[in-house]
């Protein structure tokens, strides 16, 4: 996405999925990424940096778990640069820890932010402090056999407001992956970051679907979600992870 910097000019958003050594423990992810990698990235002149980490604070299971035994990424690194063509130094830094790295040039829609809904107050914590609650981060490709514009319209005009109405989201960052930065990357069109008030709002179905203990409402909301999902992606290739959000350098200005 093109963002206007505070002092003029525009920047682009890139997102990198980072796979660490298989067997890396959750309590090792934070020190590695926040203390080892993030300072180097910040020194490289980035305009903004956010890390979503599968760390010791993100222990609850995903609502849509990956197949048993699959090696899933442990970090999603979002960064803002002047020009994606000069991303080489960034990738060199990330490759210090990554056994696999997949980057995408994305267009971001900040559909909702902290303080816009009743589920959270406006952000009041500084850069470098973990965001409260928990994230779910989903990836999916365009559903095979669909027209792109119709698919995109359904995602943006129907799925986004529907899920906003029946789920307790604090923040919803909708990233449209317009192109992979390496041809060997997975085919993705969407990287969706959703923040929730607490882990219990993800693990408790009645809280996750705002049914207030009513099983009929729960069933109706789950059915609505599944019907929308079937028009968006293949459940066999869609992935969802629970992660911690770390805003390390907020992009200023607009």
Task: Describe each PLM feature range.
Residues 2-254:
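Macromolecular interaction modules
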């Amino acid at each position: 996405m093109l963002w206007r910097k505070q002092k003029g000019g525009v920047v682009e958003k890139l997102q990198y999925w980072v796979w660490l050594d298989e067997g890396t423990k959750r309590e090792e992810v934070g020190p590695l990424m926040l203390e080892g990698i993030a300072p180097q990235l910040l020194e490289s002149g980035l305009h903004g940096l956010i890390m979503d980490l599968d760390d010791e604070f993100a222990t609850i299971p995903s609502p849509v778990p990956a197949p048993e035994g699959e090696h899933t990424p442990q970090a999603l690194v979002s960064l803002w640069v002047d020009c994606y063509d000069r991303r080489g130094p960034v990738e060199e830094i990330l490759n210090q820890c990554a056994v696999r790295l997949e980057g995408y040039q994305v267009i971001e829609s900040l559909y909702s932010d902290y303080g816009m809904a009743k589920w959270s107050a406006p952000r009041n914590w500084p850069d470098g402090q973990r965001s409260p609650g928990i994230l779910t981060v989903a990836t999916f490709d365009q559903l095979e056999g669909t027209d792109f514009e119709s698919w995109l319209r359904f995602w943006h005009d129907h799925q986004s407001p529907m899920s906003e109405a029946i789920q307790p989201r604090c923040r919803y960052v909708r990233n449209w992956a317009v192109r992979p930065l390496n041809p060997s990357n997975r085919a993705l069109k969407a990287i969706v970051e959703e923040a929730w008030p607490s882990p219990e709002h993800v693990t408790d179905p009645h809280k996750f679907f705002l049914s207030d203990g009513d099983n009929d409402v729960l069933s109706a909301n789950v059915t609505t979600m599944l019907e929308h999902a079937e028009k968006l992606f293949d459940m066999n290739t869609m992935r969802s992870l629970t992660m911690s959000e770390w805003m390390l350098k907020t992009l200023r200005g607009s």
